[in-house]
Amino acid sequence: MEAFGGFFVDEKAARVENIFLEFLRRFKEADAAEAFYETELEAMRSRESTTMYVDFAHVMRFNDVLQKAISEEYLRFEPYLRNACKRFVMEQRTGENRAPIISDDSPNKDINIAFYNIPMLKRLRELGTAEIGKLTAVMGVVTRTSEVRPELLQGTFKCLDCGNVVKNVEQQFKYTEPIICVNATCQNRSKWALLRQESKFTDWQRVRMQETSKEIPAGSLPRSLDVILRHEIVEKARAGDTVIFTGTVVAVPDVMALTSPGERAECRREAPQRKNGSGVQEGVKGLKSLGVRDLSYRLAFVANSVQVADGRREVDIRDRDIDGDDSERQKFTEEEEDEVVRMRNVPDFFNKIVDSICPTVFGHQEIKRAILLMLLGGVHKITHEGINLRGDINVCIVGDPSCAKSQFLKYTAGIVPRSVYTSGKSSSAAGLTATVAKEPETGEFCIEAGALMLADNGICCIDEFDKMDIKDQVAIHEAMEQQTISITKAGIQATLNARTSILAAANPTGGRYDKSKPLKYNVALPPAILSRFDLVYIMIDEPDENTDYHIAHHIVRVHQKREEALAPAFSTAELKRYIAFAKSLKPQLSSEAKKVLVESYVTLRRGDSTPGTRVAYRMTVRQLEALIRLSEAIARSHLERVVLPAHVRMAVKLLKTSIISVESSEVDLSDFQDADDGTNVPADNDAGQPTEMDAAPQQDGPENEQAADTGKKKLVITEEHFQRVTQALVMRLRQHEESVTKDGDGLAGMKQGDLIIWYVEQQNAQGAYSSTAEVKEEVKCIKAIIERLIQRDGHLIVIDEGAAPAADDGAARRTSESRILAVNPNYVID
């Protein structure tokens, strides 16, 4: 047998080859009629592959001695195992009208072998010199991949002295020439020429693997290892994948240690041949003698199979395969489809699925619903011009400290295998997108993936999003909308895919969220970033006795009983299968849903332009696209193939509760209300037939101690009502001031009574009141608002207190109504 450039017979290896060939011929499953690996040959023909995948559990069941020999000395027996596979293929290719795997035109074509399902999965830290040459499986996260290059496997060399040709010189992980010419009269040892046409090359790729976060001991940095991929398994592992590599550990020369400047450069001064001759210095001549001169080696892993740890179906939550082609639907077994249909038929299934999201966190149903829709996502579309329309949903959570924001991010990063969790404060622009690094061996520049690239077809969770620097926030603008990353550095110009959903968490600027201010004043995020989020949720930590009791009871129960305290309707595995099945659906918009979408968008735009209303950010076309994505995600959650109007209405409700609910904060005016009931309003102000009052004062809240002591009821109105009345009064006072300035006659301010009468008449003309009682309550609120604007906010000032009447019982009332009010010159309308 020919091996390693010489002729010798390895009897043990030959026996292993024969036993393995017998295994391929005879092994059958329990109820199978034909041999298992004859069926594997059919699969190889169908995919035009030259790699035979062997389940190592089958080898263990067939012959224990064979599995022990392969496990202990895999590197020694690997050429013989490949030869056994080739013999098996050659035997099976005759006698049938099938396309042969090895044709007559290429009889020297090799069959590669790939083992999987190794019982003992090693950790990356456990790989040492004791594992060299053994068959091992190791799991890690791919962080960098090189380009695919040709590698010389077996070289054919020509002797430059005598012209003799030496074939099949196997390369020992470095450029290996024949030791000596086979011609007995030549004795050449160094002068060789490589015949590339007769040599054997294969595809080669180097992958950088890093141990998973769960395997890193406390206080340690993550270890990394280079993995060598050959043949058909190149490009099977992408950056960000959690992968199981099966292969063996080898020792390879450390190029970096040999080429470090000033450390191991060897020089030799030859003796001068003549008296006046000068010495000649000779340094390192290249990499031909690599590993010979220096005992500098490092460990690497040569893989023969690549297997995604959690299954490609769960990794690719975007329902796109490795090549990004989403035309093929995933295949599901009948049992899986029956289970999904059973979950769909459970009463109130949608709320139960929402409750199954992050069960350790109590409440926050809206945020859990948003995370579910983000996991489902919308339908990815491509226009005729080739423009990609984003189907991924971005969610931002803004809230006070200790509101479980990070818990939601950790849960989402854990349920989706292809996900990245990072912190905005410690992440740079290059760390989030991509950076250009230099290859240590070749010196060429390559692209190293950042967090968004590692989360391609997954979810990127960014905590402390508001703590990022401005220059780093700008870097993710393109990734959030176009879902690409453009790089022009070091002579490399590339556009990379970053098809990821972003789940971000941010804290308010003042430590606590101020409900009296819009979102843009509470979060240090520019409008360009905020508009790219489909949903923005506010989490406010307000004391509430009932809610606090349930939260405390839930947390104590989780600490006491651990998993027993959590009883979600569906387990995490069931939830993953349901999401995977729902993502295989591509719902289409119906004509009725289209009409509802257009009407809803017009209504939202109208509300954005109405004076006195304050939304989190401007309504743009991005919000219309967000409505479409949310509607498609809701249709997927119901396993519908058509988007119905009910789905659109639910999406509109979600959008409103996420970005407009911030306005519904309350303003307490109990300290500013007057003792009277406002009965001095002219009688003609309660006429007309108006409809329902827009924002009535809330009288059913808990009593305020100070108000109770003085015999007053608590007066609470909505923030929207407060802002609307404030802006109307200020605008009226400004108009009056401008008219007085223009005419040059009269007082610059208005009487408080005249101002109140003007506002009530304006509202009455619009049909805002249905009874005299509502008018009285409105006047009471306006008086309290004016008092707050004067005493606390300082937006209004009193020019003249007015003349006090002689009657004692009406003095205070008429004095309050007769005082002259004006706008503070320093106040600017927002």
Swiss-Prot record:
Pfam families xrefs: MCM (PF00493), MCM6_C (PF18263), MCM_lid (PF17855), MCM_N (PF14551), MCM_OB (PF17207)
Main location: nucleus
Iron-sulfur in keyword set: no
ZnF locations on chain (C4-type): 159-186
Binding site for ATP: G399, D400, P401, S402, C403, A404, K405, S406
Disordered: annotated span: 671-710
Short sequence motif named Arginine finger, residue ranges: 531-534
Annotated EC: 3.6.4.12
One MF annotation (Gene Ontology) recorded for this entry: ATP hydrolysis activity
Localisation: Nucleus
GO cellular component: MCM complex; nucleus
Family matches, as CDD domains: MCM6
Keywords: ATP-binding, Cell cycle, DNA replication, DNA-binding, Helicase, Hydrolase, Metal-binding, Nucleotide-binding, Nucleus, Zinc, Zinc-finger
Assembly description: Component of the minichromosome maintenance (MCM) complex, a heterotetramer composed of MCM2, MCM3, MCM4, MCM5, MCM6 and MCM7.
Role this protein plays: Probable component of the MCM2-7 complex (MCM complex) that may function as a DNA helicase and which is essential to undergo a single round of replication initiation and elongation per cell cycle in eukaryotic cells.
Protein name: DNA replication licensing factor MCM6
Organism whose genome encodes this protein: Oryza sativa subsp. japonica (Rice)
